[in-house]
Curated annotation (Swiss-Prot):
Organs and tissues of expression: Widely expressed.
Coiled coil: none
Chief place where the protein resides: cytoplasm
Biased composition (Polar residues): 707-725
SUPFAM superfamilies to which the protein is assigned, alphabetical: RUN domain-like (SSF140741), Ypt/Rab-GAP domain of gyp1p (SSF47923)
Name this polypeptide is given: Small G protein signaling modulator 2
GO CC, any one term: cytoplasm
């Protein structure tokens, strides 16, 4: 029984932890939390469940339905803080009761807010949790909970959560953070969309209909020669905009209020089809009142991705402004009610069939309230005591007023006609007013002016003229027709002038575009269908044929298949070394074995060198900090300088994009001496062995030399000779074990980490003694500057390796050791750059796919030739941002202008992590493989800067969401962080390839 009760308590506490985490994340992202945030409601519900758990009946009140009110009232008698909450809640409840007018829906009232300076009305959810919510906003909820935990015997049973000596204080401690946040009532511009998560925004976008085409309409045409669309494209754009507004209006926002909503309202769009059920809603904005009806198939998302079917149903959707409606016909049947809207031009809208149950009368009641104060129904609905709104009961006045309501005999009327009138306004059908609204001035159009000529006999000369252009000078029609003719001619000149200057600006800009974008893509287009089959990718059969007959397969054809279709997973281990440059296409098996042998020898040599230096680093750490001997991960360092560096580095979170390293290594006097060099020269170089270079040994002069040339391989050769003489048997075993890095933990496990259990203490002590002897022999071989640099880099590597892709099945402790060995080997050869956070993210997929330490080391070295420029010591990131700015400014000018207006995030800093890690953290692991191999193949097929087009494809994939929600810089970072690992990688690649092709065509002007 006790375990079940503990499980309930843990579940309640876990719910509170989850909601606290959500609300703290929102506060960090947006710098504030709105009082109407859904996270506040969820947190209040979770806390209330904890407070009501095993609450005594005496404390809850025997007859009170609101247990929270009873609890706070009782606690308020002895706790001053809770007493203040009681007074505030009573004031809120009195205000809510005092602002309830009859005939106005509560939903509309709640959305209106406070116009009189009083506190805004609370939502039903907020009223439900008003006690906890008020205590939270007043920042005293943690104090109230702490008081309840300390005095639990008065209010709770023994099994209650707050009566638990552990769970009670924990609950109070959890609420300290939310009680320290700032809560606001202001309706900021970004509040209305930031409440929904990224997934909800994407779901709303999918409901609207099929995804917009790539060349979506913008304020100005995109550069390039585009085919003319049919006249139906304009209607498609209007339908898309209507669909977007319809879906957004179904959710509450700052622009409109939802006055009425009813599902399963039937509409028969055509005579030859059945009635379609849908969602009917009535929306009120500051200027207008609009009726909307959306088919249920679109609301439920049951149509899938069929663009044709969605477009058909969007044709059925209704959006009717009531400013265009003059009268409403209502018919009541036993099965329900029917409503027909009649527009100003006499056209009847499709009938709306309401289900039975008074829904038609409810709609008319909300409509009448929405028309106020400017408009009203004629005749108005009647108010009957005890029933509310009812249909009017009118008698026939005369035969002239046949339009008015009348009773059908002595029975109850079933058919009604209501007019919509606006008292105090001029007649709705005044044509001059309509023209003025459209900006054409007060002149009447021709179809309104012609009757003026036909009235009377003053214009007979005009009608008797044989030529339509020959009008007598005394004709009275001239003053009426002349302004219209001048207006049309002026409009024609303006249209032609705008078209000409737009074309001229386009041509002038095109030359500039070619100059800026020509370097981003290859000018020769390699299509996927010549020869066909490239979209299937590089399969196992094609690769086996290439292995058998390499002369008949061209490298470009293989790369084309990889670019358009990817690589079959089974052969990635064999193909990736070719894509990264470890092997060259066309190599024989013997040549590949020679390359592998050279790389393996080089890797083992580097492994031994940095491990020897690591022994010295560890010895110096033990001498400097004996108290922290068993806490290497805390960042123990050699001197105060490195201590400050490590302390600064330890504060960097892995959730940030990159840790910027300000440490500057010593400037070498000779570029050849900036890193350790081998004593022996490598053999004749073979293709693909760029890692191995011929280097000369540098003689070591004195141990006091502070020159960077002391980082040479004559030191390592001295260490190696001491090993050969048997000075450290333990280290020889480590060196030998390093040769089989792919089969188990690397040697670093013995030299870096402290023993995890007492059974390992003795072997570790022996190895430490051997390391001390070795350190005593060769400690003078390294400069203090070098040792400090190595210590700092080892600390950073160890910290990142332990948290690198922890949830992926491959990275068990032995494989993490292998990852560390490869990473340390690379950094040892590039100490001038050092380790920067993010490098492990680039190495991990290579090790997973290749599953070979030496091969991963070589491929990673080739990969870093391109990627190292993205890190702080390189300058490629600024170039990426500038190119992204040019691309989106040219290909999507409307989105670029939006970015420039909303805080000017056209510097594209939100792409930093994308470029730094080649989208590693944005995609699932399997998708990372597919994207990376396309990036590598694209260097030879379409563009050496294909990462730019993938980044642009990510932005374009969510273009409408970004534009519709008017996102600023913070919003777009939050959106893409939430969408990480939820992207459709194949769709992103398809868009990226299309963008490359578009730029190629733009440059060629085809």
């Amino acid at each position: 029984m006790g375990s079940a009760e503990d499980a309930v308590k843990e579940k309640l506490l876990w719910n509170v932890k989850k909601e606290v985490k959500q609300i703290m994340e929102e506060a960090v992202t947006r710098k504030f939390v709105h009082e109407d945030s859904s996270h506040i409601i969820a947190l209040c519900g979770a806390v209330e469940a904890c407070l009501l758990h095993q609450l005594r009946r005496r404390a809850a009140g025997f007859l009170r339905s609101d247990k929270m009110a009873a609890l706070f009232t009782k606690v308020g008698k002895t706790c001053p803080v809770a007493g203040e909450i009681c007074h505030k809640v009573q004031e809120l409840q009195q205000q809510a009761e005092g602002r309830k007018p009859s005939g106005v829906s509560q939903e509309a009232l709640r959305r209106q807010g406070s116009a009189s300076g009083k506190a805004p009305a609370l939502s039903p959810q907020a009223l439900k949790h008003v006690w906890v919510r008020t205590a939270l906003i007043e920042k005293v909820l943690d104090k109230v909970v702490q008081y309840l935990a300390e005095n639990c015997s008065k209010y709770y049973e023994k099994e209650a959560l707050l009566a638990d000596p552990v769970f009670g204080p924990i609950l109070a401690s959890l609420l300290v953070g939310p009680c320290a946040l700032e809560y606001t009532k202001l309706k900021t511009a970004d509040h209305y969309w930031t409440d929904p998560s990224a997934d909800e925004l994407v779901q709303r976008h999918r409901i609207r209909g099929p995804p917009t085409r790539q060349d979506s309409p913008a304020k100005r045409p995109a550069l390039g020669i585009r085919k003319r669309h049919s006249s139906g494209s304009a209607s498609e754009d209007r339908l898309a905009a209507c669909a977007r507004e319809c879906v957004e209006s179904l959710h509450q926002n700052s622009r409109t209020r939802l006055l009425y909503g009813k599902n399963h309202v039937l509409v028969q769009p055509k005579e030859d089809m059945e009635a379609v059920p849908g969602y009917l809603s009535l929306h009120q904005s500051a200027e207008s009142l609009t009726l909307k009806w959306t088919p249920n198939q679109l609301m439920n998302g049951t149509l899938g991705d069929s663009e044709l079917e969605k477009s058909v149903y969007w044709d059925y959707a209704l959006v009717v402004p009531f400013s265009q409606v003059v009268c409403i016909h209502c018919h009541q049947q036993k099965s329900g009610g029917t409503l027909v809207l009649v527009s100003q031009d006499g056209i009847q809208r499709p009938p709306l069939h309401f289900p039975q149950g008074g829904h038609l009368l409810s709609f008319l009641s909300c409509l009448e309230n929405g028309l106020l104060p400017r408009g009203q129904l004629e005749p108005p609905l009647w108010t009957q005591q005890g029933k509310g709104k009812v249909f009017p009961k009118l008698r026939k006045r005369s035969s002239i007023r046949s339009v008015d309501m009348e009773e059908m005999g002595t029975g109850r009327a079933t058919d009604y006609v209501f007019r919509i009138i606006y008292p105090g306004h001029r007649h709705e059908h005044n044509a001059g007013d309509m023209i003025e609204m459209q900006g054409f001035g007060p002149s009447l159009p021709a179809w309104h002016l012609e009757p003026l000529c036909s009235q009377g006999s003053s214009c007979l000369s005009c009608s008797s003229s044989s030529s339509p252009h020959a009008t007598p000078s005394h004709c009275s029609c001239i003053p009426d027709r002349l302004p219209l003719r001048l207006l049309c001619e002026s409009m024609k000149r303006q249209i032609v002038s705008r078209a000409f200057y737009g074309w001229l600006a386009h041509c002038r800009h095109l030359s500039t575009v070619r100059t800026h974008l020509s370097a981003l893509v290859h000018h020769s287009v390699i299509p996927p269908d010549r020869p066909p089959g490239a979209s299937a990718g590089l399969t196992k059969d094609v690769w086996s044929k290439y292995q058998k007959d390499k002369k008949n397969y061209k490298e470009l054809e293989l790369l084309r298949q990889v670019y358009y279709g990817g690589i079959e997973h089974e052969i990635r281990k064999d193909v990736w070394p070719f894509l990264l440059g470890h092997y060259k296409f066309g190599m024989s098996k013997k040549e590949m074995e020679q390359v592998d042998a050279v790389v393996a020898a080089r890797y083992q040599q580097v492994l031994a060198e940095w491990k020897a230096c690591e022994v010295v680093v560890r010895q110096r750490e033990r001498e400097a900090h004996p108290a922290t001997r068993t806490k290497f991960s805390s960042g123990s360092s050699i001197d105060s300088h490195v201590q400050r560096l490590i302390h600064r580095d330890s504060t960097i979170s892995n959730d940030v994009f990159i840790s910027v390293d300000d440490l500057e290594p010593p400037e070498p006097q000779d570029p050849e001496d900036s890193r350790p060099k081998p004593e022996q020269e490598a053999g004749p170089g073979t293709p693909g062995t760029a890692v191995v270079e011929q280097q000369h040994s540098v003689e070591f002069d004195s141990p006091d030399s502070g020159l960077p040339s002391s980082r040479n391989y004559s030191v390592a050769s001295g260490i190696q000779s001491s090993l050969d003489e048997g000075q450290s048997v333990g280290f020889e075993e480590e060196d030998g074990g390093g040769e089989e890095g792919s089969s188990g933990p690397g040697p670093a496990a013995h030299t870096l980490r402290e023993p995890q259990d007492p059974s390992q203490e003795k072997p570790q002590a022996g190895e430490l003694e051997a390391g001390e002897e070795l350190a005593a022999v060769c400690a003078a071989a390294y400069t203090i500057e070098l040792l400090d640099t190595v210590a700092l880099n080892l600390h950073r590597i160890d910290k990142d390796v332990q948290r690198c892709d922890r949830n992926y099945w491959y990275f068990t402790p032995p494989n993490l050791e292998r990852l560390r060995d490869v990473m340390c080997s690379y950094v040892w050869e590039h100490l001038d750059v050092g380790y920067v956070q993010g490098m492990c993210d680039l190495l991990a997929p290579l090790l997973v796919t290749l599953d070979n330490d030496q091969l991963a080391y070589s491929c990673f070295s080739h990969l870093m030739k391109r990627m190292s420029q993205n890190f702080p010591n390189g300058g490629a990131m600024d170039t990426h941002f500038a190119n992204m700015r040019s691309l989106i400014q040219i290909l999507d000018s409307e989105l670029f202008e939006l970015m420039h207006q909303n805080g000017d995030y056209t510097h594209f800093y939100f792409c930093y992590r994308w470029f730094l890690l080649d989208f590693k953290r944005e995609l699932l692991y399997e998708d990372v493989f597919a994207v990376w191999e396309v990036i590598w193949a694209a260097r030879h097929i379409s563009s050496e800067h294909f990462v730019l087009f993938i980044a642009l494809a990510l932005v374009e994939a969510y273009r409408e969401i970004i534009r519709d929600n008017n996102m600023d810089f913070t919003d777009i970072i939050k959106f893409f962080n939430e969408r990480a690992e939820h992207h459709d990688a194949q769709e992103i690649l398809r868009i990226a390839r299309d963008l490359v092709h578009k730029v190629q065509m733009l440059i060629e002007n085809k």
